[in-house]
């Protein structure tokens, strides 16, 4: 969850969204991070870089969906999956997490594209 107004405006403008605009948000974040302005500028204050990277990945999903309209391009958060990354303290098994990604990958040809799913549920960016 990002409350940085400029970042929200840039990433929320779907029609004008571009790789350059995503880079602008990343560079704004990096500048604020280096200057210790994360909280002041409205960036997440917990697992900050991770959340920004996922937000930008979701924005990039929209770009790819538009660029490659003949394909279904979506992003999926599988949930808090047990993995080496989190010292295996996740809630879901790898199989449970993968199940939802496979479900989204197998959407019909006329299914949604440019969307974000939390597990198998359509979610807002």
Regions found by a protein language model. Give the residues of each.
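Catalytic loop of short-chain dehydrogenase/reductase
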Residues: 1-69, 77-78, 88
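C-terminal helical subdomain
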Residues: 55, 75-83, 87-125
């Amino acid at each position: 969850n990002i409350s940085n107004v400029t970042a929200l405006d840039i990433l929320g403008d779907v029609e004008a969204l571009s790789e350059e605009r995503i880079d602008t948000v990343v560079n704004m974040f990096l500048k604020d991070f280096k200057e210790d302005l994360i909280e002041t500028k409205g960036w997440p204050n917990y697992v900050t870089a991770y959340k920004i990277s996922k937000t930008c990945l979701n924005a990039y999903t929209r770009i790819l969906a538009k660029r490659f309209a003949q394909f279904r391009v979506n992003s999926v958060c599988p949930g808090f999956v047990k993995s080496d990354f989190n010292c295996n303290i996740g809630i879901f098994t790898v199989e449970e997490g993968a199940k939802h990604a496979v479900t989204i990958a197998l959407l019909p040809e006329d299914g949604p594209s440019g969307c974000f799913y939390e597990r198998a549920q359509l979610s807002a960016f």
